[in-house]
Amino acid sequence: MTIATAINLENMTTGEAKLTLDKVIKQIAQRENEELLVAHEDIVIIAYALENNLQLRDYLMGLTRDGLSVESVAGILTVMVDLFKSAYRSTYTIETVLASYVYRLGDSAGALVLLANGLARDYSLAKLLLRVFDQGLAPDTFAMMSQGLHGKVVEELTRTQELLANEANR
């Protein structure tokens, strides 16, 4: 007999959330036209973490520094949007991050569409990206800025890995 247990999101650490995020990114990146099987609990954890931890969200903004192409990251995040939807989770965080990669690919119109959900929620990153896009910042410049911050974000995630993922000062 199997007993289902609820995920205790309130007690999840930043380190645990990052491990789950990295695991799912790897699963998506390594699949080759195979059916993707991601645990529902993993999607719930990631959705919660991205809504409650700015460092984890910002970590996604610099994934190209970890050796992935802009196209690959955009593809991974697109799959994650679909996974969030299939798990009935809010998509505004992942769509906003995806908008930054779509912008880097030169599709400003597509990036603006992806920001809509975040802007409707008054999401700070969506508002910041809208200002960046409206100012016409070159995608290459934006990419360099994001990559430049990634090392600092990773350092902060390492430093705070034992803290709760929803720590109040995030």
Q: What feature does the model see in each segment?
A:
Residues M1-N169:
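Charged, compositionally biased boundary regions
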